[in-house]
Amino acid sequence: MDSSRARQQLRRRFLLLPDAEAQLDREGDAGPETSTAVEKKEKPLPRLNIHSGFWILASIVVTYYVDFFKTLKENFHTSSWFLCGSALLLVSLSIAFYCIVYLEWYCGIGEYDVKYPALIPITTASFIAAGICFNIALWHVWSFFTPLLLFTQFMGVVMFITLLG
């Protein structure tokens, strides 16, 4: 492989700066330079797309047709699993809003997962544990439909949060 082709591949892979290329030239790899187009950053996908709109709409439909809030109101004080799931969901949503509102919007830290690597796993674990607790608490109401209904609700919440940040 000739040096100019190797340099192009290296530039594409690691996006070398021009001064790094000058150091490569000083090491004895002098050859004809070929011009390469600067890679453009890809546009991020829009936050509200068909996929997120579907989950939010499905969550609203499930909430309406299965009397979700009425069922939650009736089972609020009868099950400790429901209270535990509510606390875990509150922890998960609090961390998510802390990341989105405070770290990203207020402090301007776009890469908060790099600066605070423990936040994402803690949020994910508490969200999954909340889902398990809600499944146990509401199993007697909807039986084997409970995981499907709660998954639809959780996906609606997740897609709604992604609209914010």
From Swiss-Prot:
Annotated transmembrane regions: 49-69, 81-101, 119-139, 144-164
InterPro entries: TMEM128
The keyword Translocase is annotated on this UniProt entry: no
Keywords, comma-separated and alphabetical: Membrane, Transmembrane, Transmembrane helix
Pfam families tied to this protein: TMEM128
Gene Ontology, cellular component aspect: membrane
Compartments where located: Membrane
Superkingdom classification of source: Eukaryota
Keyword Transmembrane applies: yes
Entry membrane topology: Multi-pass membrane protein
PANTHER family to which the protein is assigned, alphabetical: TRANSMEMBRANE PROTEIN 128 (PTHR31134:SF1)
This protein's name: Transmembrane protein 128
Species this protein is from: Homo sapiens (Human)
Lineage: Eukaryota, Metazoa, Chordata, Craniata, Vertebrata
